[in-house]
Amino acid sequence: MKLKHILYFTAIVLLAGSCQKSTTEEHDALFKSIKKVYELKPDGSMNYHYQHQLKYITHLSFNRMYGESFIIYHPDYQELTFNTVETTMADGKVVKAPENAFNKVLPRFAAGAPAFNHLREMVVTHTGLELGCTVNFDYEIHSRAGYLPFINENIILQEDVPVEQLEIVVKVPEGTELNYTLLNLDTEAKVSSSEGYTQYSWKFKNLNNRVYESNQPEDQRHLPRLIFANVTPEEALQQVAAEDSPLNDEIRQYVTQRITGKKKEIHIIRELQKLVGDEINDFNIPLEYARYTPRTPDKVWQSNGATPLEKSILLNKMLNFSGIKSELTYAQPSFMYDQSLGILNGAGEFYNVVTLNGEKLVLTTDARQANNQAFYLKDHVLLDIHGQSIDQPVSETEAEPEVMVKANFQLNSHGELSGRAEVSVLGANNPYLNYLDQVENAREVIQSVFPGNTIQDYEVKQFDFLGNKLSADIEQKELWKNQGDYYIFSLPRSSYGIEGEHIRILLQERETPLQLSQTINETYEYTVKLPEGFVFTAPEITRERTNTLGSVSITITEEDNTLNVSHSLTINQRMITPEEYHNFLELMHLWRNETFQEIILKKIQTEN
């Protein structure tokens, strides 16, 4: 009996211990320390010094996550030096990296981009890895004077695993101004001067690991980050505009050939988007590895490939040559914009702003662009190539999205639905460019709600850069599913509403914000005349939810054998914080509830 009690007590202790994992045991690895030092020398050369100590906790940490380290550099202008690459094993044995642990390869993003085949990626394979080991990694990159035009860093401070200590140091010659901003953390910079340098340092402790969830902000605005540069927006963008050479004769002749016979400006735009976006290869080289400096149009044309910036510049020059006034524009999320801080590294995108039919449109280089990109840039700052702020092409009130569907239908005893529908779309999902290109493309507005094969005829009542309104004759066969004497069907919703956000799984709670591409305002009002011999089985349905985030209203009533169906959803903000997420969840659970989407009819058996 005594032994039984001892075993029972031991089991409880072991179970309790297994339920109280330490922070270390909850993660695959742990950065004991990371240090990054950026140094600008008086002659314009730069030095980057990186160090870390990483403890490996699980097999995943060395099999998939941190078994190798990757360093991209330009061997002709940058010198890579390793100070320490060694592993301290769990028993204290130190294993230094052998010579064959260092291998140069072409960076993946430079594959197929001959103009950037000079870049190299040093792949460092860490050796002696096992559970509980620690890797000490220390290297430096020295850049020759003139290779990098300025300091331009945009550092997300979190890693995929926790960091116990992170230190970032920036050294610039005295008299050189360094502009910086720290987002989502409150640590102050420590500034000191010594030996002709001004030093800025930040120290962070116990940083949590990054959390990945669906529908996070694309610009990662929720993450802690440090941004610094020794140039203003004007000075940074001057580097982009430095090679402002005109199109050569060969390019001009080819452009002339491509646009000859095209009367409408939109057709010229589409042809040039197709030329630049589809027929010139994509060189997806990050700006920093292209030295923040675009190649000339001549070199781009000869290589038949371009970086995103080079494509925007080339399209801009082709548009202006073709008689369409275009302005190269840099769009930066407003949360990271500072008029004294010229950041290009992972901070924004380049577009072309043109005036078409008296309205300003923001263009990409994609020939499949359906709408005015300006609607997606409402929370961005737009800068011209000289770093000067320019007005938004659409105002906040004009940019509000809306989907409205109204229809009067008749349903026959064979489950065939027919009638007239009216669809209106305002804001970001309005396919204005597609409509200007081909009037027949207006049909896609109707198809956002009703299957294409159900549209018999349609009429365009309004279509401009802000929105549209169309009506259509709809005939749909086999609308319902039959289960005995019961017939079940649902009425459609638009892919331009919340369904277009592709939120597949609703977590019960989130650790990070959920971002929508736009605010939501969608309304559906249907009347359906039921066939004789069929009745609506459910009692009248009225469900409403309203909270600080928006509202849902679902109403289904029946009168004189006619159903009146009304569904509406509003979500009044794009960014939904974890604290507000429960409100979003409440609205979505009601909106997606199949009980209130399905309409169930019963066939009445008539007596012979």
Feature map (PLM): residue ranges:
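Early extracytoplasmic/domain-onset interaction patches
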Residues: 22-73, 79, 396-423, 456-457, ...
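Surface-exposed, acidic/Ser/Thr-rich flexible loop segments
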Residues: 62-64, 69, 122, 128-183, ...
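A surface-exposed beta-strand-loop module
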Residues: 84-155, 186-221, 406, 410, ...
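Secretory-pathway-linked proteins and extracytosolic
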Residues: 142-290, 413, 419-435, 483-485, ...
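Hydrophobic/aromatic-rich core segments of domains that either
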Residues: 309-395
